[in-house]
Amino acid sequence: MTRREFFLSIASAAGARAVPTISQAPLIVPVHLVLDGQAKWRPEQLHYFWSRIWPEAVRDLASCGIRLQSSLRTGEVWRHSGREPEVIGLDSGVINFVISDRIPIEWDNGRALSGVTTRYRGYHLCMVALNHAHCHQIPLLAVNTCVHELLHALLQDIFESRPAGWRGETREFRIDLYATRLWLFHDGAAIRKAARIYVERLQSEVKPRT
């Protein structure tokens, strides 16, 4: 199979055809970017994130009519041995997108994950680890870390615990498939539809800032 046939097979299997969204008003998704003040990262890691990884995610989602409305502040991720990490600087009614150097071991079970998405004490939280985060690299296998984690929220996986075994792997593949379709074909109609429902649920939840 040639590379072209491979890409076309993805589009065919997923019913992929880019759906123009230019005439539609953009769907606003509020994202609260939180820089982990406890992280130990290199300057080039931050530069790579702000110049490559994050802009790529913003462009991809914009291509299907989703606008990330972002704010930025410094927070902290405190890692405590044997118990849940403590994340400071979160807001309600937004996706809290925490930028750190590594995922707490209690959340990644020592697997050196590039990102994680979860509900943390009622807050909606995505976290990326700059030690492992990357742009789009390989369709279906290594997609943009920010896109991958945001899709777990926008497609409403965040409301359910990750299934064990092959069901969990299937959910990850589903996210990578959606990310690949968005990346290669700008096909995000299903994402936008799910995201609209997600934003309504997100903004119905109110908690004070921690």
Please give the residue ranges for each predicted region.
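N-terminal secretory signal peptides and thylakoid transit peptides that target proteins
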Residues: 1-14
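Helix N-cap and loop-to-helix transition residues
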Residues: 2, 42, 46, 184-186
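Positively charged, low-complexity intrinsically disordered regions
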Residues: 4-5, 18, 112, 182, ...
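Propeptide-to-catalytic entry region of secreted or membrane-anchored zinc metalloproteases
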Residues: 7-8, 18-106, 159-162, 199, ...
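Active-site-proximal segment of zinc-dependent metalloprotease catalytic domains
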Residues: 88-163
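The catalytic-center signature of Zn2+-dependent metalloproteases
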Residues: 132-210
